[in-house]
């Protein structure tokens, strides 16, 4: 109820409800007092009564109506995690986030904002990740790109900055051409220095991705990346904890965007040194190579435009034979 491993909830009404239901299970079992298994049974029964919408979301994914991959790798595509509030309860499901890039003047387009589906906090998160990109690479070369970010198959409002880490990784993937593992999902916000910040609904998010992976079959490669600052909030279901202990599922706590990049791609982040040097083959090196390619394209487009203008002016200045 408190969604915190170090705190207890002071909301007495839901606690009373669980205790009464646990007492019912204890009485039915002929127990003299309420034991842990009776409390677990009460919590499980409560979840079953409130999971119709959650199961509907899961069914849409399994039937291929809602496109979510849990295997393979794709460029510019990341599994984010979205929370759906349902009164006093909530659940989470994976949400595909994609990024595309082309030559431009350094603009990062938030499609959710453009169509008025994105809230101010989400828009702030996109601006912050854009600032991180400019701060890390903009002093070495011009950001001659135009990028687009979107929550795919999102037909309602998008608010909050908890997907900004996923959006940043999708953008870096699109720029570098490095594919992102679809067996992993990620949540967390980032600041302008790439530090990963805590977010809400952390347990629901992990359990939401776990449920999908469990139905499709756990193979030890699936998992969720969370902010390190959220570790104190972990209160996961027993089946999730058991899967992690058995090595069939994983939860990684990351402190910065570079850690997340390395886990999600398997490629070293390659943080630039004071001279701007980066390890060959690293993500940062490949991003710079992608930016240089876009800059060359931009210059070529501009040169062709000037030549076309000159040709047009020359044609206009020639006398016509009568």
Could you tell me what each predicted segment is?
Residues 95, 101-117, 121-322:
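Peripheral, non-AAA+ core regions of ATP-driven protein-machinery
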Residues 41-42, 48-119, 130:
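Core mixed alpha/beta domains of very large multi-subunit molecular machines
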Residues 5-9, 29-30, 88, 116-120, ...:
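Generic amphipathic alpha-helical segments used as scaffolds and interaction surfaces in large
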Residues 32, 66, 78, 82, ...:
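Compositionally biased, intrinsically disordered low-complexity regions
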Residues 11, 15-18, 32, 90, ...:
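Active-site-proximal structural scaffolding
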Residues 2-70, 271-276, 298-305:
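C-terminal helical "lid" subdomain and adjoining coupling/linker elements of P-loop NTPases
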């Amino acid at each position: 109820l408190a969604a915190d491993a170090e705190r207890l909830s002071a909301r007495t009404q839901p606690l009373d409800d669980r205790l009464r239901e646990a007492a019912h299970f204890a009485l039915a079992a002929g127990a003299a007092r309420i034991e842990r298994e009776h409390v677990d049974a009460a919590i499980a029964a409560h979840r079953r009564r409130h999971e119709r919408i959650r199961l509907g979301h899961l069914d849409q994914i399994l039937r291929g109506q809602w496109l979510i991959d849990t295997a393979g790798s794709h460029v510019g595509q990341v599994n984010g995690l979205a929370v759906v509030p349902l009164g006093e309860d909530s659940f989470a499901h994976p949400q595909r986030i994609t990024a595309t890039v082309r030559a431009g003047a350094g603009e990062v387009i938030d499609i959710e904002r453009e169509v008025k589906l994105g809230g101010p906090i989400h828009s702030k998160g996109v601006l912050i990740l854009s600032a991180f990109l400019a701060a890390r690479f903009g002093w070495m070369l011009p950001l001659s790109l135009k990028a687009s970010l979107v929550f795919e198959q999102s037909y309602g409002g998008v608010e909050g900055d908890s997907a900004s880490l996923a959006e940043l990784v999708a953008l870096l993937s699109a720029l570098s051409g490095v594919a992102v593992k679809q067996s992993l999902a990620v949540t967390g916000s980032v600041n302008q220095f790439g530090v990963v910040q805590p977010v809400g609904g952390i347990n629901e998010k992990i359990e939401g991705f776990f449920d999908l992976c469990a139905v499709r079959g756990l193979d030890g490669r699936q998992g969720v990346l969370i902010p390190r600052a959220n570790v104190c909030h972990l209160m996961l279901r027993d089946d999730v904890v058991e899967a992690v202990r058995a090595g069939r599922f994983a939860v990684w706590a990351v402190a910065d965007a570079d850690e997340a990049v390395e886990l999600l791609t398997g490629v070293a982040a390659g943080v630039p040194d004071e001279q701007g040097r980066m390890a060959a083959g690293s993500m940062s090196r490949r991003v710079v190579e992608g930016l240089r390619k876009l800059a060359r394209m931009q210059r070529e487009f501009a040169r062709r435009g000037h030549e076309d203008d000159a040709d047009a002016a020359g044609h206009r200045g020639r006398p016509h034979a009568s």
